[in-house]
């Protein structure tokens, strides 16, 4: 089964959370994933959401483009991916919803570069999975 699968099962099954959210960072690229009950079956239930933020000064775009971009069509649970821009994840959390803005800089080499919202998502209470807004 593997450690990660076992950990996910324990975390999600034992806690009975209606829409768990994982937020993590600095993979040198930005992601939004649906967490699936069983990844080999793309039609399995969505049980949560993961938001991954990059570092504001990340600069490994070419590597991640080669490593990941070609596999996105095989991973329909990926809702957003950006390997080119450094940035951060901005969250606004209430009891009703979790709103996320994927904030990314136009340039990591220019300290005066604009930071803009590349994508926005919402996770509603009791409804697992992120919806793009």
What are these regions (language model features)?
Residues 1-133:
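Long, structured stretches of catalytic cores involved in phosphate-ester chemistry, encompassing
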């Amino acid at each position: 089964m593997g450690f990660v699968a076992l950990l996910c099962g324990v975390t999600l099954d034992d806690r009975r959370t209606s829409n768990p959210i994982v937020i993590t960072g600095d993979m040198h690229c930005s992601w939004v994933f649906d967490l699936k009950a069983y990844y080999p079956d793309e039609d399995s239930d969505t049980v949560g959401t993961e938001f991954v933020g990059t570092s504001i000064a990340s600069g490994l775009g070419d590597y991640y483009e080669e490593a990941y971009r070609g596999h996105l069509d095989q991973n329909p649970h990926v809702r957003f991916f950006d390997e080119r821009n450094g940035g951060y994840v901005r969250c606004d959390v209430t009891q009703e919803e979790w709103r996320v803005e994927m904030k990314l800089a136009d340039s990591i080499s220019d300290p005066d570069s604009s930071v803009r919202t590349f994508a926005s998502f919402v996770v509603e209470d009791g409804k697992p999975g992120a919806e793009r807004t």
